[in-house]
């Protein structure tokens, strides 16, 4: 049982509007990147391979192929570093964790699109 004050603080920090997405979906994450004095937005587009729902400690992992090399990045869902999330495509998968995609490449790593 968590303290009421802690619950209230977590609820305030979780007030950000996040679209619903699931493993297999292709999403675009706009990340705030600070370079010296200036700040800019960097888009990271890829397939969600894992999602961890733990309230304020929720996180998700996105995988993309960049210059022929697989790149994975784990984001905290309610992080202030995330500016926005957009779902580009819904994937039709049967597993919650898509770690098997790490071993696949090319056409074998494609995910069917959910129809509906």
From Swiss-Prot:
GO CC annotations on file: cytosolic large ribosomal subunit
Molecular function per GO: structural constituent of ribosome
UniProt KW Ribosomal protein keyword: yes
GO biological process: translation
Keyword field: Ribonucleoprotein, Ribosomal protein
Superkingdom to which the source organism belongs: Bacteria
Keyword presence, Acyltransferase: no
InterPro entries, A to Z: Ribosomal_bL19, Ribosomal_bL19_CS, Ribosomal_bL19_sf, Translation_prot_SH3-like_sf
Pfam entry (one): Ribosomal_L19
Function statement: This protein is located at the 30S-50S ribosomal subunit interface and may play a role in the structure and function of the aminoacyl-tRNA binding site.
Family to which this protein belongs: Belongs to the bacterial ribosomal protein bL19 family.
HAMAP family xref list: Ribosomal_bL19
Protein name: Large ribosomal subunit protein bL19
